[in-house]
Amino acid sequence: MKKIYLLLLLSASLGFAQIPTGYYSTATGTGYTLKTQLFNKIKAHTAISYSPGLWNLYYTSDVRPDGKVWDIYSDCIFVFGTFAATGGNQDTGTLGSNECERYNREHTFPKSWFGGPSGVPMYTDAFHVMPTDKHDNSLRGNMPYGIVGGTSSYTTNNGAKIGICTAANTPASLIVFEPADQYKGDVARNYFYMATCYEDKIASWQKITTDGDAVLDGTSDHVYENWYLNLMLKWHAQDPVSQKEIDRNNAVYAVQGNRNPYIDHPEYACKIWSVACAALNTNSFELIADINIYPNPSNNQRVNIETENELDDIQLININGQIMQEIKKPSAQNHTYTLENLPKGFYFLKLSADSRSITKKIIIN
């Protein structure tokens, strides 16, 4: 547990400068008491419109460093706006039967689980409604997120997969959508947010759909079935809060007037669901807690990876999921690995050691 908390506390420090003074002053408890305190803080917010509200928000909440739409399902290159207005890729009801043609609005927490468009304000809550590839969104449908351990029936442009879930204690033959590693923490924190912001409603959603029933446990405090909560906590630790999420949190706050506490304070997840956190294998997080990447963003085409771990493999992956550079058995000096002559852009660094891996987001200016 010490190493998990170290990771989460380090991640939390990224966003402190952006959190309004005193915003979490009433969040003083632990366990479900803390969750209810957070519920009371974030439940009241401005419900924005489905259209044009969400479309307009995405210009500031989901913009990549290159100015394109940030799509977590495919990382396809999408231009903001409609084709008629800007030559963009926003969905207008045409195209999208193939990947990388159109982006639309994805309820990462499926809307059918809470009753569809009648579920207000959940239906337009930007913290979980994100821009994604229209084709991939349609294929995911109402599937829960999960781990596809065997053969996948479909793989997206950035490596997300659809197939039978192999996470521990999963319902038999459950078909799930597994996001790319670099976005697993993002969706996990969406689910913690939904469990908290809608604490007064979520217990009643369990039996609305079969897929929702596989994930929800019918309570307002624990909220999720153990298999799903354990998976979300694992992803929360393996893919720490990034600058992308911090920027998105601030952009949504500017419009909705509330925040995602688990982006501002990642440590809250284990303070609330402490029993589930304690059940996790802390060895799997040792690599994550012991890595420092700097400078990030980098202005000199160079990044340093400082860690006490002996890395087996370093992969530099672009936003389309392509491996741009791979170093097997890299050498370190004073526990520091250095990558040089990196081209400008946004990348993912996948670091592996002793069958463990972690993906970090980096920007080269």
State where each predicted segment sits.
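Domain-level detector of nuclease and nuclease-like folds
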Residues: 95-104, 111-279
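Residue-level detector of functionally pivotal "anchor" positions at catalytic/ligand-binding pockets or at interdomain
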Residues: 275-294, 307
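Short, surface-exposed loop/turn motifs with a glycine/proline- and acidic-biased composition
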Residues: 328-354
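Short coil/turn motif common to extracellular beta-sandwich-like domains
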Residues: 296-304
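Short, glycine-anchored, charge-dense loop/turn motifs used at functional sites
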Residues: 316-324, 347
